[in-house]
Amino acid sequence: MTNNGNAITVEGLRKSYGDFEAVRGIDFGVREGEVFGLLGPNGAGKTTTVEIMEGLRPRTAGSVDVLGYDPGVQVNALKDRIGVCLQATNLPEKMRVHEALDLFAAFYSRNVDRNQLLKRLQLDDKRDEYYSKLSGGQKQRVALALALVNDPQLLFLDEPTTGLDPQVRLEIHKLIEELKSDRRTILLTTHYIEEAERLCDRVAIIDAGKIIAIGTPREIQERTLDKSIIEIECATGLPEETPVFLGELKFTLSEDRRHLSVKSSQPARSIVELVKWIDQSGLELTDIHLKRPTLEDVFIELTGKRLRE
């Protein structure tokens, strides 16, 4: 039985290593059947948080409920119901794909049909292949198969597409979307904003051990940044002296002063003023466009870093 319709409920979670507090009292819930993304720069505490939920690391304080179990004391009962796909899965070079599946299946009290699983993950023609002969994308599909061999209710995906080329990453995205259609609960950590926007129903942004935003990608964008972004390009550099109205807005200017990016809650008015200023300065406007802030913009605004830093 899960907690109030949540597959995962975390309350007041803390984890310390000596005097260093890696996780500083976080609270969140993951609903049954949703894909929940955990985003954060390196060292933010997301890996520690996930490992605590998986039962791989003890917590210092707080409570964690995963599918009705406390992973700190009931990990053996929990392991039959979760699947874990790590960022890097290394198997013996001479192990065949079907041998890896048979080995992992032996760890659990319940299994799926392995032949059907291989077919679903487009590995049926690789069942007798040595692990060392597989491509990077095929190895990642094997890692997914190993995480699914016990037909888990909850799947942990730790940066499942890191290091893969764009085409292979797209193939993995499609597989995850198929898993999502099963109404299986998935917790995803990723270093790719576009991956979170495409796959996640909701996301939490964690930084310095604390959750600083949570909601759907659109909710976070609208709640955190209510300003549009105006981007302007001129044939030559903009004047050294900026107008008064620009000083009241948040803006960035390229080193050669040809590219200007302005955040404004009144974009129509700001565009009129910007174009008027450029015209009065005798400059040639070569490009102008307006965009809403992306999840990447929000992430940078909240953490001061890009996700892959």
Task: Label the predicted regions.
Residues G5-V10, K15-A208, A213:
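ABC transporter nucleotide-binding domains
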Residues K15, F28, L121, E231-C234, ...:
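Preference for bulky hydrophobic residues occupying beta-strand positions
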Residues G83, S109, Q122, E222-D226, ...:
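A generic structural signal for secondary-structure junctions
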Residues H173-S265:
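ABC transporter nucleotide-binding domain
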Residues P267-E309:
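C-terminal coupling/interaction segments
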